[in-house]
Regions:
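Conserved loop->alpha-helix
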Residues: 141-143
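A short beta-sheet element
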Residues: 57-58, 68-139
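A short glycine-rich beta-alpha junction/loop motif
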Residues: 9-10, 113-121, 151-174
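Extracellular/lumenal glycan-associated surfaces
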Residues: 19, 27, 31, 177-189, ...
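Short, solvent-exposed loop/turn positions at domain surfaces
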Residues: 43, 79-80, 152, 184
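DNA target-recognition patches
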Residues: 30-33, 43-76
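Non-catalytic DNA-recognition/assembly elements of restriction-modification systems
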Residues: 14-40, 63, 165
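Short amphipathic coiled-coil heptad-repeat segments
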Residues: 1-22, 192-212
Length: 212
C-alpha cells in the first residue's frame, strides 16, 4: 500500500493500493442495507428457550465472528415471535446499553444461521458493500457513533431512524475485496503471534514448576 498524495480528491483514503484511483462512493446505511432488529421470546413459556437456534444478545458481540450463543431458542419461539433466521455472514451490532464501554461499538459477523434480540441490529447488504468491509468501518467509527448519537436517560440506545441516516464511504467491489483480504492476513498473523505467546507462557509456567 502507498500514501495517497492526491489532495485534489476529498473522498479518498490516506493509504491505498496503488492500482486503485478515483474517489470512493458515498451512500447512507439505509440505502445500502436492509436493517432488522429482533425481540425476546416470552420466558413464561420455557419451551421457547429449549431449542437449537442461536439467539444473539448485545453482550455477545465481542469477537469478529459469532458461532454460538449462551441461550438458544426453538423453532416455535422463532415462529411465534416473527424472528428472522439470519443467514451466515450477517453483520450485527449492539444498539442497547451503549452507555457501557464494553457494549458501545461492538459488532460481529455470524458464522451460523441465527436470530437476534431487540438489543441488536442486523445489516443485510443490498448491493454495493460487503459485510466484512462494513465490519472494519464500524470497528473504526462505532464507538464514536454510540457516544454522539445514542439516546436515552438511564440506557443509551441507537434506533433504526438514526442508523439508517449514517453515511458510509466505500470503494468498488474489487478494492473492497483486496482490503478485506489484506486485513484478514493481518488478523491471521495476530492470531499466530497470540498462540505463540500463550505457548511460551505455558512453557514458562512448566519450567518454573520444575525449578522451584
Amino acid at each position: 500500500m502507498a500514501n495517497n498524495n492526491n489532495k485534489d480528491k476529498c473522498n479518498v483514503p490516506n493509504l491505498r493500493f496503488p492500482e486503485f484511483s478515483g474517489e470512493w462512493e458515498m451512500s447512507s446505511i439505509g440505502e445500502q442495507f436492509e436493517l432488522y432488529s429482533g425481540n425476546t421470546p416470552s420466558r413464561m413459556n420455557k419451551n421457547q428457550f429449549d431449542g437449537s437456534i442461536n439467539w444473539i444478545t448485545s453482550g455477545e458481540l465481542k469477537e469478529h465472528y459469532i458461532s454460538d450463543t449462551k441461550e438458544k431458542i426453538s423453532e416455535e419461539a422463532a415462529k411465534n415471535n416473527s424472528l428472522k433466521l439470519l443467514p451466515v455472514g450477517t453483520f450485527v451490532i449492539a444498539i442497547y446499553g451503549l452507555e457501557a464501554n464494553g457494549v458501545r461499538g461492538t459488532c460481529s459477523i455470524t458464522t451460523r444461521e441465527s436470530t437476534i434480540s431487540q438489543a441488536c441490529m442486523a445489516f443485510t447488504s443490498k448491493m454495493d458493500i460487503q459485510n466484512e468491509f462494513l465490519y472494519s468501518w464500524y470497528k473504526k467509527h462505532g464507538n464514536i457513533i454510540g457516544i454522539k448519537y445514542a439516546q436515552g436517560t438511564k440506557q443509551q440506545n441507537l434506533s433504526y431512524d438514526i442508523i439508517e441516516r449514517f453515511n458510509i464511504s466505500y470503494p468498488c467491489m474489487e478494492e473492497q475485496k483486496k482490503l478485506i483480504r489484506f486485513i484478514s492476513l493481518i488478523d491471521q498473523r495476530i492470531a499466530t503471534q497470540n498462540k505463540i505467546i500463550e505457548d511460551l507462557k505455558k512453557l514458562k509456567s512448566a519450567i518454573i514448576e520444575k525449578l522451584y
